[in-house]
């Protein structure tokens, strides 16, 4: 039996194992399908909308009612009226509303008398996104209300609208957003979250697949099937899993940039390259972890920790430049970081090969990492002298 036949024998053996253990299906296709449905529907509108904002109107004037109507008309906010601050505060602490706005009694009279009435905000900071968006919505409406009051006063003094706008807003802002032009959370986050989740799945599933041979005491049978060659055994297993993960990655890219029409300034085919390279690099990391820690439970724990850290250190939520210097260096150890940089250059800037060729080299370097511990894993497979839990 030649080497290729042994690889196919190992691959057929792996397919039988997958068929007999539904955990593999649920841990790969099931998880990524659930996450895709969850994130793509949760962020369907780009930003969370209709965030409940409690309003305690103690003034009951035309101005306060107009303020509430304008706040309710915004995309982000949905006004919930309360008769007292205590009931509004109780609902905010229980998470039913994201913020409370208290309009003081006599606000309209104070405005007419130029006594600067104070509108009080209370924002629930435990829910960062909803709290920040509610704060932004309230602040915007207060500024607009201030402008409306000043406009009416200046109109009464005989100024025309052009002069009034020059006084209310002497400096105009011309904003040009680079990258996420539409300010759409779905476009920006889902394009990284789903590949990041796939990286986690690749690492954990491969660790479990290799560690299960030790856990169930079947590693010697695997070595017999591969002709006592660990490289052949790994190639047989990777033949199955690489095709499976590549198919999942292909569907993710097609889903994002073809079926859902996420904006992309570069080529979708280049994103296929990025996805496949990230999958190969993640497989290499999974193999390396089980080589260094041939104890399934411990290896899975380390693999999960490594995968989660990848989300934090990839830089797509908090810029890497804002992190401590010693943390910035660690970011290069995560394939998702290089996928993110590839993504920025291709999807956002459309830079092409000139923008992401370095990331290709970095991802290819990961493929050599498993060479460090091949002998250690081979001895573990043959002697089975590590804990099986």
Residues covered by each model-derived region:
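Alpha-helical membrane-protein architecture signal
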Residues: 4, 8-12, 187, 226-227, ...
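Membrane-spanning alpha-helical segments of multipass transporters and channels
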Residues: 38, 60, 251-255, 263-389
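Selective transmembrane-helix segments that form parts of the transport pathway or gating/packing helices
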Residues: 228-255, 360, 364, 368
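Residue-level hotspots within pore-lining transmembrane alpha-helices
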Residues: 195-198, 243, 247, 277, ...
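Extracytoplasmic/periplasmic domains immediately adjacent to an N-terminal transmembrane anchor
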Residues: 1-187, 380, 388-389
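Hydrophobic alpha-helical transmembrane segments
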Residues: 129-146, 179-194, 213-225, 245-253, ...
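Helix-loop-helix units of permease transmembrane domains in multi-pass membrane transporters
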Residues: 205-243
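Long, hydrophobic alpha-helical segments
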Residues: 190-209
